[in-house]
């Protein structure tokens, strides 16, 4: 199976999207049980990012859990997460910074780096702006040190964006972004041991391409993020 994390609902969504087969979820569930088809186990989120010790700028939670946008580039969420790879007994880390659009749930931009620093986040933002020069979204993040940096706030202002931040210790304030990390790690990362940086980076890049272009989502109307994005552009 391409994604062992798939449960019966996602299998049914793929049947509708890829083959035009329309049956109800209960029938797919019965078939899955008869064939002993099960999704992989779920893993719990390990917690929220702490607030920066000496924040230079803090924004209100203007998003306020309004996780809906009528148009692309209306609301963007962002965050950084870490991955591990192994060289014998040595453990190494890489970091993924990404921006997610709330209308179509596409990954607008991402950067992979060896350090969780300002440059990682700034590059991610610059890529998003370069690809969407006319975008002026509400820009939401947690209160990590990169996002409370005065220089980053100035970059947002220059791009005509309004900054929003989660409350301290409230992961759900950035729920869809945290949800994307969970999806990626359940489907491609947890339960695997990566023996090289190259292998891990290839997995991440391949998955984001798969997620944007091939992974259908029920709340998008059984469309992929890029299909939803194109649909919105045509309707504008």
Regions found by a protein language model. Give the residues of each.
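Conserved, non-catalytic sequence blocks in retroelement Pol enzymes and Pol-derived host proteins
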Residues: 4-5, 20, 68, 86, ...
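Active-site beta-loop-alpha junctions of metal-dependent nucleic acid enzymes
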Residues: 92, 110-132
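RNase H-like two-metal-ion nuclease catalytic core shared by retroviral integrases
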Residues: 52-54, 141-143, 149-152, 163-185, ...
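An active-site-proximal beta-strand-loop segment
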Residues: 65-108
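C-terminal domain-tail junction helix/linker
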Residues: 157-161, 183-236
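Mobile genetic element proteins and their domesticated derivatives, centered on retroelements
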Residues: 11, 28, 32, 63, ...
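Basic, flexible linker segments flanking DNA-binding modules
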Residues: 1-71, 170, 224-233
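Short small-residue beta-strand/loop micro-motif enriched in glycine and branched aliphatics
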Residues: 104-110, 163-166, 190-191
